[in-house]
Amino acid sequence: MNESPAQPLTETIPVFTTQNLDIYYGSHRAVRDVSLTIPKNKITAFIGPSGCGKSTILRCFNRLNDLIESFRLEGKVLYHSQDLYSPNIDVTAVRKYIGMVFQKPNPFPKTIFDNVVYGARVNGYKGNLEELAEDSLRRAALWDEVKDKLKASGFSLSGGQQQRLCIARAIAMQPEVLLMDEPCSALDPISTLKVEELMNELKENYTIIIVTHNMQQATRVADYTAFYNAEATDKGNKVGYLVEFDRTGKVFGDPQEQETKDYVSGRFG
């Protein structure tokens, strides 16, 4: 294993930087020594087998792991060079600027309109909520499908529409970053294609990090790819680590590490 995985060229502004990141749950180290830089207005995919820490690392970027009592972190997670885990950080503000889209669509038991503007309303948004809802739904490529039924329940939509509604809800908070944890795993192929097309449109205005088990999806949407692997510990747990991080074409077409070659060729995973 290469202890200093290849880093992509930093021709764009870095949004996140991790430095020697270790993640623990109680005494168990779940992730070890991850150092990487996430570039602005690009799509970065996290790939790797189950248990390698992809989602755990993703949740560090908006501090969702804080909700797990046994969680602790060593090393640094920097957002525009600011330490996200500094005692002075406003975690609520972090989650405003760094939105999250989960594996399964999770609309609220509210109307389509109220789903979109919920976060903005709760946070005291002073602008026009109707304009915000329309703009967010347009950005999420959903407006034309729901503009005549904004008072209908979010649950009335198809699975793919619900996921785009959740993306619209995240966009309405006017974030800089969208974190997506396997956003297409519960969707059919047609809905998946729509979400992938949407991601490519959104990267003009947002930095996107996506966790995916689907390597074909990573090759279709990601500008950069980070491959993680895991190894067993003496106690029978797994610890994840970063193997390789580079442009997606390089990771899949000319990987530098044998582990990466084995994974992308389907030899394990």
UniProtKB/Swiss-Prot annotation:
Residues 16-255 form the ABC transporter domain. Transmembrane segments: none annotated. One of its GO terms (cellular component) is plasma membrane. It holds the Pfam family ABC_tran. One of its GO terms (molecular function) is ATPase-coupled phosphate ion transmembrane transporter activity. PROSITE patterns: ABC_TRANSPORTER_1, ABC_TRANSPORTER_2, PSTB. It is a peripheral membrane protein. The keyword Zinc does not apply. Belongs to the ABC transporter superfamily. Phosphate importer (TC 3.A.1.7) family. The complex is composed of two ATP-binding proteins (PstB), two transmembrane proteins (PstC and PstA) and a solute-binding protein (PstS). This is Phosphate import ATP-binding protein PstB 1.
